[in-house]
Amino acid sequence: MSYYDNILEIDSNLDGNGLCIGIVMSRFNIDVSEGLLGACTAELTRLGVQEADIVLTTVPGALEIPVALQKLAESDRFDALIALGAVIRGETYHFEVVANESARGLAAVGREYNIPIANGILTTDDEDQATARMAEKGGETARVAIEMANLVLTLDEMDQSAPT
């Protein structure tokens, strides 16, 4: 932490040591999902999360991700959760429904259980766009999960040490 003109600033913290991360991955558009997963887990371990502290579960599609995240959140075992998948535009309105409802579900679970959830569900016009974005987005979700887990832990510590 640093002080700037008498304002306490909480620095970002990308140290994954000691964190437990849950990942829910959609099996729909599996090649893209696995690309996201590979980049995500590589970045998690590079930042210090132990493989034994990463739990992966898979679900049929993006709409099922929030339910699995909710069950992981209920376990109170995880410091942060990650959602991975790809919703690729088709010729029907279904794309918008899946993209919007999966994102809404992630946000609802995060708020209800007070747990950070990194959204790695790609929404693209075609498979080429998804393939082009999967490596960067996979790594980004790992960094978001670690940074937000550490922020929540820091804020919890500050709350506990505050005078009552």
Swiss-Prot record:
What GO molecular functions are on record for this protein? 6,7-dimethyl-8-ribityllumazine synthase activity
The record's active-site residues are: 94
Pfam families from the entry?
A: DMRL_synthase
InterPro entries from the UniProt entry: LS (IPR034964), LS/RS (IPR002180), LS/RS_sf (IPR036467)
Q: Which Gene3D superfamilies match?
A: Lumazine/riboflavin synthase
Mind listing the GO biological process terms from this record?
riboflavin biosynthetic process
Q: Does the keyword Transferase apply?
A: yes
GO CC terms on record?
A: cytosol; riboflavin synthase complex
Enzyme class label: transferase
Q: Which UniProt keywords apply?
A: Riboflavin biosynthesis, Transferase
The pathway to which it is assigned is:
Cofactor biosynthesis; riboflavin biosynthesis; riboflavin from 2-hydroxy-3-oxobutyl phosphate and 5-amino-6-(D-ribitylamino)uracil: step 1/2
Task: Quote the record's binding site residues for 5-amino-6-(D-ribitylamino)uracil.
Answer: 28, 62-64, 86-88, 119
Catalysis performed (reactions)? (2S)-2-hydroxy-3-oxobutyl phosphate + 5-amino-6-(D-ribitylamino)uracil = 6,7-dimethyl-8-(1-D-ribityl)lumazine + phosphate + 2 H2O + H(+)
**Entry binding sites for (2S)-2-hydroxy-3-oxobutyl phosphate:** 91-92, 133
Q: What is its EC number?
A: 2.5.1.78
Q: What does this protein do?
A: Catalyzes the formation of 6,7-dimethyl-8-ribityllumazine by condensation of 5-amino-6-(D-ribitylamino)uracil with 3,4-dihydroxy-2-butanone 4-phosphate. This is the penultimate step in the biosynthesis of riboflavin.
Q: Which family does it belong to?
A: Belongs to the DMRL synthase family.
**Protein name (Swiss-Prot/TrEMBL):** 6,7-dimethyl-8-ribityllumazine synthase
Per the UniProt record, the source organism is: Nitrosomonas europaea (strain ATCC 19718 / CIP 103999 / KCTC 2705 / NBRC 14298)
Task: Recite the lineage of the species.
Answer: Bacteria, Pseudomonadati, Pseudomonadota, Betaproteobacteria, Nitrosomonadales
> What gene makes this protein?
ribH
